[in-house]
C-alpha cells in the first residue's frame, strides 16, 4: 500500500469517526453526539486528503464556516458527494448550511449550491469580484439551484448597493419555489426602490417581506424601509411608529435606533446614472457624488446650450448691431469667469437687457439665443425664457398683480424673463399714477436686484415709449445694463428672409420669383407714421416684419397645394413608386411668382381682418 493510499484510507476512517460523533449512523454503527470530536475528525480528514470535498463539507456541518473551509471545498468540488454516497449517508442526514450573512442559511446539497454558499461568504468578506466570477461559472439545471443563484447574486448586488441590479434579480411578478428566498428578496428590492427615491412603490413592495414574518431579518428591514419612506414624504408620526416597531422587534437593529434618535436622519438616495459612473463597480464610494454627477451633466448640457445659442444667433438674418452687443456681453462674461477662476476680483454686474424696436424684428429670438449662451457659460442654470406681459400679470385687484408677478419671477429663477411690450407696464390716465403697473414694477425691481446673479430680464418694446415708461421709475432704468436696438427689415432683407424661410422646408424660391414681392415690401417699408410717444412706425412694423413674411410663405404654400391638386397629384399618390427624380420633386418644392403673389394678398387680408 502506498503512502497516498494509506492517507486516503486514514482520511476515510476519520470521516466515518466524525460522522458518528455528529450523530449520523454509518454502516449500522451506533452514533454519538460529541461536536468537539466530530470537528477534530473532519479537520484530520481534510489534512490527510484535501481532495475529499465531503470532508470539507463536513467541517461546515460541524460549524467551521470559515473562508478557508469553503475555499477547500470548492477546490475539491470534483469529488462532491463521493464519500457520503459510498457510506450510504443521505442528504437528509448530511445537510451542511452556510449563512449568507444577512437573512438566511443556505443548504449545500449540490455543486451549484456550494458555489452559491461560497459566493455569499466571499461577498460578506468584500471579495465581490471573486463572488461574481464564481456565480458566472454556475449553470444550474435544477430549478431550486437556479433560484439560489439568483438570490445570492441579489445578495451581492445588495451588499454593493447596485440597486437597479437588485431589482433585476427580484422582479415582483416572478414566482419563487422557496418562500424564504422570496421574502428576503422582497426586502432587498424594497431597499433598492427606496434608495432610488421610488418611495410609494417601495412601501408597497415591503409587504411581501412583512406578511407571514417568514424571515424576521427581512421583515425588520422592510418595516424600517417603510418607516423611512414615510419620513421622506413628510409623514413623520407614522414613520416613528414603524421605527419603534422595528426597534421593539430587534433592539440591535442600529439604523432604527439612529433614525429614532435623529429626526433628520434619511436614506442615502442615488440614481442609476451615478451607480453606473462608479470607478469600481462594487464600491459605492467610488461613484461621483450627486453634486459631481449633476455638475458633469450640467457641463455637458452647458456646452450644448452654448453651441445652440451661437448657432441660432449666427443664423439670424441681419441684426449686426444686436449680434455685436451679444458677442460683447458673452466675451465680458467669459473674461469674468476666467478672473474668478484665477482668484481675481470680479465686478457684480447684471445682464438685464432692453431690446428696443418694432415687433417681428427678432427680439424674442435674440433673447432665447442669448439665454442659451448664458446657460452654456454656467451663468444661468436653465435655458428657460418665460414670456410675459402686463396683460398676463394683471388680476382683479392690485394685490393680484403683485402676487402674479412674484410667482412668475420665482418660477423663472435660473433662467430669463421676456417682458413683451414692456413700455405698457405703466399706463397713463390714472390721477395718482398706475397702481397696478407700480405693483408689477416694484416686485420686478426686487428680483432684478436681489437675484441678478440667477435671473436675466429682457424688456422689449418701442424705444421712445420705453424711455417714457422708464422715466416713471429711474430705479428700473438703472437695472438695465445693456440696450440693443432693432430696426425694421428693409425691402432687400424682407426678400432674403422670404427665401430663407422657404428653405426651412426644402422649398425653392428663386431670386427672380421673389422679386414679385419687392414692390409691396418697398411700399410697406416706406409707409411711415409716428406713435403718440414719437416712435417711427412703418407699415411693415404694423404687419409684423418677420412674422408677416412667414405668413406670406405659408399662404404661398397653401396656394401651391391648391394649384397642384390635379390628375398628376392623384397619379403620384396612387402609384407604387418610392423614389422620385429631382424634376418630379421640383414641382412640389417650387414656389412660383403666382404662389408668392397670392400668399402676399392672403397674408395682408388676414392682417387687416385681425
UniProtKB/Swiss-Prot annotation:
It is found in: Cytoplasm. Disulfide bonds: none annotated. Keywords: ATP-binding, Cytoplasm, Nucleotide-binding. GO terms for cellular component: cytoplasm. ATP binds at residues 357-364. One of its GO terms (molecular function) is ATP binding. It holds the Pfam family AAA. InterPro entries: AAA+_ATPase, ATPase_AAA_core, CbxX/CfxQ, CbxX/CfxQ_RuBisCO_ESX, P-loop_NTPase, T7SS_EccA, T7SS_EccA1-like_N, TPR-like_helical_dom_sf. The keyword rRNA-binding does not apply. Part of the ESX-5 / type VII secretion system (T7SS), which is composed of cytosolic and membrane components. NCBIfam families: T7SS_EccA (TIGR03922). Belongs to the CbxX/CfxQ family. Part of the ESX-5 specialized secretion system, which is responsible for the secretion of EsxN and a number of PE_PGRS and PPE proteins. EccA5 exhibits ATPase activity and may provide energy for the export of ESX-5 substrates. This is ESX-5 secretion system protein EccA5. The gene is eccA5.
Amino acid at each position: 500500500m502506498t503512502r497516498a493510499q494509506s492517507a486516503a484510507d486514514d482520511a476515510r476512517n476519520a470521516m466515518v469517526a466524525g460522522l458518528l460523533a455528529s450523530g449520523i449512523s454509518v454502516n449500522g454503527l451506533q452514533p454519538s453526539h460529541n461536536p468537539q470530536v466530530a470537528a477534530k475528525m473532519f479537520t484530520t480528514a481534510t489534512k490527510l486528503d484535501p481532495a475529499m470535498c465531503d470532508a470539507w463539507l463536513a467541517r461546515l456541518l460541524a460549524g467551521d464556516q470559515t473562508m478557508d473551509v469553503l475555499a477547500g471545498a470548492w477546490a475539491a468540488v470534483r469529488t462532491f458527494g463521493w464519500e457520503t454516497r459510498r457510506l450510504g449517508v443521505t442528504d437528509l442526514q448530511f445537510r451542511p448550511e452556510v449563512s449568507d450573512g444577512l437573512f438566511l442559511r443556505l443548504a449545500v446539497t449540490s455543486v451549484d449550491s456550494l458555489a452559491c454558499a461560497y459566493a455569499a461568504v466571499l461577498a460578506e468578506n468584500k471579495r465581490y469580484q471573486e463572488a461574481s466570477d464564481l456565480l458566472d461559472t454556475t449553470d444550474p439545471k435544477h430549478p431550486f439551484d437556479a433560484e439560489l443563484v439568483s438570490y445570492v447574486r441579489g445578495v451581492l448586488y445588495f451588499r454593493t448597493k447596485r440597486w437597479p441590479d437588485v431589482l433585476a434579480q427580484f422582479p415582483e411578478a416572478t414566482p419563487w419555489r422557496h418562500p424564504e428566498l422570496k421574502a428576503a428578496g422582497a426586502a432587498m428590492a424594497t431597499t433598492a426602490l427606496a434608495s432610488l427615491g421610488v418611495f410609494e412603490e417601495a412601501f408597497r413592495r415591503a409587504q411581501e417581506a412583512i406578511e407571514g414574518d417568514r424571515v424576521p431579518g427581512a421583515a425588520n428591514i422592510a418595516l424600517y424601509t417603510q418607516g423611512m419612506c414615510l419620513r421622506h414624504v413628510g409623514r413623520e408620526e407614522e414613520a416613528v411608529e414603524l421605527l419603534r416597531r422595528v426597534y421593539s422587534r430587534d433592539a440591535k437593529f442600529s439604523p432604527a435606533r439612529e433614525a429614532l434618535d435623529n429626526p433628520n436622519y434619511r436614506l442615502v438616495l442615488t440614481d442609476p446614472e451615478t451607480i453606473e459612473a462608479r470607478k469600481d463597480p462594487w464600491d459605492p464610494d467610488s461613484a461621483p457624488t450627486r453634486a459631481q454627477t449633476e455638475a458633469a451633466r450640467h457641463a455637458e448640457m452647458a456646452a450644448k446650450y452654448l453651441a445652440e445659442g451661437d448657432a441660432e444667433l449666427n443664423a439670424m438674418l441681419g441684426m449686426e448691431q444686436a449680434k455685436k452687443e451679444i458677442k460683447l456681453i458673452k466675451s465680458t462674461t467669459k473674461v469674468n469667469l476666467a478672473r474668478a477662476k484665477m482668484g481675481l476680483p470680479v465686478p457684480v454686474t447684471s445682464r438685464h437687457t432692453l431690446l428696443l424696436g418694432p415687433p417681428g424684428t427678432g427680439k424674442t429670438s435674440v433673447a432665447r439665443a442669448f439665454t442659451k449662451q448664458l446657460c452654456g457659460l454656467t451663468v444661468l442654470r436653465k435655458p428657460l425664457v418665460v414670456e410675459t406681459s402686463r396683460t398676463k400679470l394683471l388680476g382683479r385687484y392690485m394685490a393680484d398683480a403683485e402676487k402674479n408677478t412674484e410667482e412668475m419671477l420665482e418660477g423663472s429663477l435660473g433662467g430669463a424673463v421676456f417682458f413683451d411690450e414692456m413700455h405698457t407696464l405703466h399706463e397713463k390716465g390714472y390721477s395718482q399714477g398706475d397702481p397696478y403697473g407700480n405693483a408689477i414694477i416694484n416686485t420686478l425691481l426686487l428680483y432684478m436686484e436681489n437675484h441678478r446673479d440667477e435671473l436675466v430680464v429682457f424688456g422689449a418694446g418701442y424705444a421712445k415709449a420705453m424711455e417714457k415708461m422708464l422715466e416713471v421709475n429711474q430705479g428700473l432704468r438703472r437695472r438695465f445694463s445693456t440696450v440693443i436696438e432693432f430696426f425694421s427689415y428693409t425691402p432687400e432683407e424682407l426678400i432674403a428672409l422670404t427665401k430663407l424661410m422657404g428653405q426651412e422646408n426644402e422649398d425653392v424660391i428663386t431670386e427672380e420669383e421673389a422679386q414679385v414681392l419687392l414692390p409691396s415690401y418697398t411700399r410697406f417699408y416706406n409707409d411711415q407714421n409716428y406713435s403718440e410717444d414719437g416712435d417711427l412706425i412703418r407699415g411693415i412694423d404694423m404687419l409684423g416684419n418677420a412674422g408677416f413674411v412667414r405668413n406670406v410663405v405659408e399662404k404661398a404654400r397653401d396656394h401651391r397645394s391648391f394649384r397642384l391638386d390635379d390628375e398628376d397629384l392623384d397619379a403620384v399618390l396612387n402609384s407604387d413608386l418610392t423614389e422620385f427624380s429631382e424634376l418630379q420633386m421640383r414641382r412640389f418644392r417650387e414656389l412660383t411668382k403666382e404662389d408668392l403673389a397670392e400668399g402676399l394678398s392672403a397674408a395682408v387680408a388676414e392682417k387687416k381682418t385681425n
